[in-house]
Amino acid sequence: MARVYISSVIAAPAAKVWARIRDFNGLPAWHPAVAESRIENGEPSDKVGCIRDFRLRNGDRIRERLLGLSDYDMFCTYSILESPMRVDNYVATLRLTPVTDGDRTFVEWSAEFGCAPERESELVTTIGAGVFQGGFDALKRQLGG
């Protein structure tokens, strides 16, 4: 299994960051790579088991299932159902932890997945630097550096 782990600190209170990212259907509002998103079958976006179907700005389409969501622990876990990345058993978690020294937020985004061995390094870099760090950088621009 390939593993990706990216962390950062956002200069904004955890509650403010969580309010921005909590909506499982809200990626277009904060992640620059996502053009549009919808929750299938009209389900609530915070219902565990709901499926988001979103389109990236490059035209690619991805479907993901919400596996876990906690307002108390400020995390979201999801799996990829369909993706052009050709990964298997992809499960990721985005987690926030309050940093009380300065009222900042420690953010972590991790994933595990299966893929062809010759693609592992490329996928780890694309997901880590492009998707995860790209999302963190956008949140920093929107909420504080």
Predicted segment positions?
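Beta-strand elements of well-folded, non-transmembrane domains
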Residues: A12, N58, P98, F113-C115
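Glycine-rich portal/gate segments that line the openings of hydrophobic small-molecule binding cavities
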Residues: R38-M85, G134, A138, Q142-G145
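One face of beta-strands
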Residues: Y90-A92, W109-A111
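A short, structured loop/turn motif at beta-sheet edges
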Residues: A14-A15, G68-Y72, L96-F106
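Hydrophobic ligand-binding cavity/cleft-lining segments
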Residues: M1-P44
